[in-house]
């Protein structure tokens, strides 16, 4: 389906993702988003009452959060290490797809108004909470040691986020001799040894 055939809401979201990725939240205007979406600015505001709500919907639609929610039913029945590897693989894939958005958000996040910082924090907290619930569920089944599941979720995603940032955003080739599968396998092995009973 071409952009012109997409429903208005989806067209606005796709255009917003593209412009936020190119110009950042601060640089992209609702006037520009509506024009490039082929709608009047008033139409944009009918779908998204504020620029903040539009940004929140872009994060909710195009980041790892919907992917994580979608894979959890399958991941919850996988063996532990396989489940961790699947989460990591999908996380890295999503980060690569959204590389430009991540780069621009890193460069301007210190300038964001509190409302936008709050949106980012709630999105990250929900993602970490889902993963923490996964660890808690596995612990209740007797598979894992007792540990702070929220910190473990942050550590787990943080390892792979740092791998992505150093290699894809900063351009350091510290792990140049490793492909994604090797990094995922190595990180998961280390992480699972620290958390498994």
Question: Which residue ranges define each predicted feature?
Answer:
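Short, structured helix-loop boundary elements
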Residues: 9-10, 30, 52, 77, ...
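Basic, helix-initiating cap at the start of DNA-binding domains
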Residues: 1-23, 27-39, 53
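Helical hydrophobic small-molecule/effector-binding pocket
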Residues: 60-63, 82-107, 157-164, 193, ...
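Short hydrophobic/aromatic patch on the recognition helix
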Residues: 38-48
């Amino acid at each position: 389906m071409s952009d012109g055939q997409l429903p208005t809401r989806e067209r606005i979201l796709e255009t917003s993702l593209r412009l936020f990725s190119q110009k950042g939240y601060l640089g992209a205007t609702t006037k520009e988003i509506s024009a490039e979406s082929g709608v009047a600015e008033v139409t944009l505001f009918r779908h998204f009452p504020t620029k903040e709500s539009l940004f929140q919907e872009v994060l909710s639609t195009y980041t790892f959060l919907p992917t994580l929610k979608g894979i959890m039913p399958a991941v919850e029945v996988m063996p532990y290490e396989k489940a961790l590897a699947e989460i990591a693989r999908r996380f890295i894939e999503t980060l690569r797809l959204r590389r430009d958005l991540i780069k621009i958000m890193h460069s301007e996040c210190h300038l964001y108004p509190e409302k936008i910082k709050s949106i980012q924090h709630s999105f990250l907290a929900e993602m970490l909470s889902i993963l923490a619930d996964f660890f808690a569920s596995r612990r209740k089944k007797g598979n894992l040691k007792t540990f702070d599941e929220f910190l473990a979720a942050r550590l787990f995603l943080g390892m792979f986020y740092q791998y992505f940032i150093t290699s894809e955003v900063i351009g350091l080739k510290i792990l140049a001799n490793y492909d994604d599968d090797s990094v995922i396998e190595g990180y998961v092995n280390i992480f699972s040894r620290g958390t498994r009973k």
